[in-house]
């Protein structure tokens, strides 16, 4: 029988998931996205060529791999078609290999307008959204009024759309004081999307389960990271979907008992984009060094990422939340040359704080407890054999394993798919 592997972020996103999905799909027949939208930014480097994907699964660069977008994803058809064209212009066949669930809620122009209007009104209290309509689209889904991909093919689309635009335009014009969304233009867009996407719509749940029954290896690709999960993240500075392994089942229709291995992608230090608490954040030369050497700029927004020491306590919780089988430690090479490395091993918690909340106020109130390890002067760039790593790098890796209670199975030593140490392959585990 085949194996079903989940690959997801264990921090605040930007951990390097795209590269690892691309690497592991050598043994996979299909890759499925199960949550999020085009707010994701997965960077892949193959033979020195960089590709950034926002919506299409990272397995698209592997010949013969079928890519699925599950029902848990909020779909922006215009962004999808643009991404498809970019890939096809680079001789990557997409249309015949991409399959999309008809149950995906659509991101409409009014969602984008609402997202941007809300952030502008928050002023200094911004959550730090990408402004791409993700949150408002999920709101419509939960409120049971979303227009889903299937609705584009139904006779009552015009009536549904008219009612929704009337509803959202009231907020846009009366509360946010911005321009209304035009009904005719939006309806025309829907008609164009219908024709462009028609051939890719399929029952993703059925297709994935048929592949499973046929003994094929499947991969489920997460977006963002565990600490941005709508339920378990630093609320309200979170995304609007279920980012954890639990989201795989609800977002694709694959039952939880069919998931064989959960791989948590983790940077060798910690980063965060936008607003929100960050206990181990650095504001000194070391933080600037990590940002410069690690090229820490968001693939989706281009925003500079905040950098800090490795937070083992936050990762330990992510391991538990996702029942992680193993960790992939990325960007180890960024730490080359640092004399000392600090690891956050726990938090000092004020007596007034609500223990166990793990929301934004909780993380804002804590101060990290640190443990200091010696760094290494040798370069780890491109190393593919664990035994060739500097001794202090090995000690750093082993200490993290002890602190989080989970093995580090893969180590990334550079951006290219080949610059990787695989200690245990998830498909062979």
Curated annotation (Swiss-Prot):
Pathway stated in the Swiss-Prot or TrEMBL entry: Purine metabolism; AMP biosynthesis via de novo pathway; AMP from IMP: step 1/2
A biological process term (GO) from this entry: 'de novo' AMP biosynthetic process
Transmembrane segments: none
Binding site for substrate: 299-305
Enzyme Commission (EC) number: 6.3.4.4
Entry-linked SMART domains: Adenylsucc_synt
Binding site for GTP: 13-19, 41-43, 305, 331-333, 412-414
Annotated family: Belongs to the adenylosuccinate synthetase family.
Free-text function comment from the UniProt entry: Plays an important role in the de novo pathway of purine nucleotide biosynthesis. Catalyzes the first committed step in the biosynthesis of AMP from IMP.
Identification of the protein by name: Adenylosuccinate synthetase
Gene name per UniProt: purA
